[in-house]
């Protein structure tokens, strides 16, 4: 560690946000919220919009810690974590390996399966294969295997004659995953403990707008589900956090088909840098267990280190 975060009463924090991924707007919102909370907690916070000159700016600023509020590619996939390790600047959230692994949905699911966690059937297919025929019986979901925030996600409903026309900016290889009907559940893990289960209620598909537009979804916490399903979500989220090697906070998303009871539960993905916007799930879950937003942000900073 180049600088000892714990030895300073109020470390100088670089709030790294923005970046160039498709999730830039979400990242800016998270960064602004966290920056304001940390300033209220007495920290010196410097806003840092990550761009091509990031390494030089970090060397000039010489922060005691980097709060990584980036989302999506480059900021959440191990790339910027590697830069911070190289510069020996303590940083928040997961390290290089866990970030890269969790960002790759196919490898994440392989890690889940190896740990005995329940998953939905899925595979990687080219755009040409998807366009030519159904690669699995509908309903199924098409999504990039290395993006978050439901960017570029398509739901192919039961009875559809063909897959939808895909946006030109999507990659050539995509994940296709069997759609699990029912409810969307999610669990935040802080350190090594699960906080609670939230049931995400929407009018339709839980897409980008449902996640980030006020009123786009309703969050019920604690989720009103059977006790064995609730306990399984909590335990599975902790296991996912551990087997992926996550640090700090993570959030694991599930689908649950109530018709199949506990057998209807499937892990979708683990987010190593959960959103911290006004409509985000992780701050709500922390508040539910008595940890206010400012205290959560403080904990994240105090947890920062190198060699994560």
UniProtKB/Swiss-Prot annotation:
Lineage: Bacteria, Pseudomonadati, Pseudomonadota, Alphaproteobacteria, Rhodobacterales
Alphabetized UniProt keyword annotations: ATP-binding, Cell shape, Cell wall biogenesis/degradation, Cytoplasm, Ligase, Magnesium, Manganese, Metal-binding, Nucleotide-binding, Peptidoglycan synthesis
Source domain of life: Bacteria
InterPro entries in alphabetical order: ATP-grasp (IPR011761), ATP_grasp_subdomain_1 (IPR013815), D-Ala_lig_Van_CS (IPR000291), D_ala_D_ala (IPR005905), Dala_Dala_lig_C (IPR011095), Dala_Dala_lig_N (IPR011127), PreATP-grasp_dom_sf (IPR016185)
Organism, as annotated: Dinoroseobacter shibae (strain DSM 16493 / NCIMB 14021 / DFL 12)
Annotated positions binding ATP: 136-186
GO cellular component: cytoplasm
A molecular function (GO) term: metal ion binding
Location in the cell: Cytoplasm
Catalyzed chemical reaction(s): 2 D-alanine + ATP = D-alanyl-D-alanine + ADP + phosphate + H(+)
Binding site for Mg(2+) 1: 253, 269
Name of the gene this protein is made from: ddl
Family membership: Belongs to the D-alanine--D-alanine ligase family.
Designated name of the protein: D-alanine--D-alanine ligase
ATP-grasp domain: residues covered: 109-302
